[in-house]
Swiss-Prot record:
bHLH domain ranges (all copies): 136-185
Domain of life: Eukaryota
Protein name: Transcription factor IBH1
Gene Ontology BP annotations: brassinosteroid mediated signaling pathway; regulation of DNA-templated transcription; unidimensional cell growth
Disordered as annotated region, ranges: 1-33
Assembly behavior: Interacts with ILI1.
Keywords for the protein's UniProt record, in alphabetical order: Brassinosteroid signaling pathway, Growth regulation, Transcription, Transcription regulation
UniProt organism field: Oryza sativa subsp. indica (Rice)
Family named by the database record: Belongs to the bHLH protein family.
Keyword presence, Transcription: yes
Pro residues biased stretches: 1-16
Database matches in InterPro entries: IBH1-like
Gene designation: IBH1
Length: 202
């Protein structure tokens, strides 16, 4: 057969960062910032490669590109600290997408299996529409920005829209979240560039 088998997912990295290598112990500095960054990159690579291993080659290119982009952001959020608002926001978006996908698949199965069913009464159908509309409007409702602090630049609201989970965040916390989000984005870009370089030489 010409079809290539999907490679198995990579081995998960060591969950205990204090024993990653012997460099930190030899230096006597304990688990420093450099080791923490290395552990985060290891976790990012693990989650991203595991997500890539689940993508089928027969998937259309446009859908595959969208899946890879979502996998990159989800793996970045899983590798980050769960205390970060941006990582929780990205993981929440991923869970919501999975829920919508499962609901659509369940609806398709129900339509296929139901051969003949009595039509719902107008009252029950109207109630279903009201509930669905309420859920949609509640989910789409934006979080209002907090009161502007003294010295806060006018473009802070634009930054709140760019950083996941930044809506409604006060300015000092927003700056901290932005810095951590940018560090993770930089690590993600380095990982993907390394993968491109690796496969370009094969």
């Amino acid at each position: 057969m010409d079809a290539k088998r999907t490679p198995p997912p990579p081995t998960p990295p060591n969950p205990n960062p204090s024993v990653i290598g012997s460099g930190a112990a030899a230096d006597g500095g304990g688990f420093g910032r450099g080791e923490a960054a290395a552990a985060t990159k290891h976790m990012l690579a693990f989650h991203f490669l595991r997500a890539l291993s689940r993508i089928h080659r027969a998937t259309p290119v446009t859908r595959r590109t969208r899946t890879i982009r979502r996998a990159a952001y989800s793996s970045m959020a899983r590798a980050a600290s769960p205390r970060r608002a941006w990582s929780r926001a990205l993981l929440g978006q991923a869970r919501a997408r999975r829920s919508r996908t499962l609901m659509r698949r369940a609806a398709v199965l129900v339509r296929r299996r139901v051969v003949a069913a009595p039509a719902p009464s107008p009252a029950s159908a109207r109630g279903v529409r009201i509930i669905a509309a309420g859920e949609t409007s509640a989910a789409a409702r934006a979080v209002p920005p907090p009161p502007r602090q003294q010295g806060e630049p006018p473009r802070a609201d634009a930054l709140r829209r760019l950083v996941p989970g930044g809506a409604g965040m006060e300015y000092s916390s927003l700056l901290e979240e932005t810095a951590d989000y940018l560090r993770s984005l930089r690590a993600q870009v380095q990982l993907m560039q390394g993968l491109v370089d690796l496969f370009s030489y094969q």
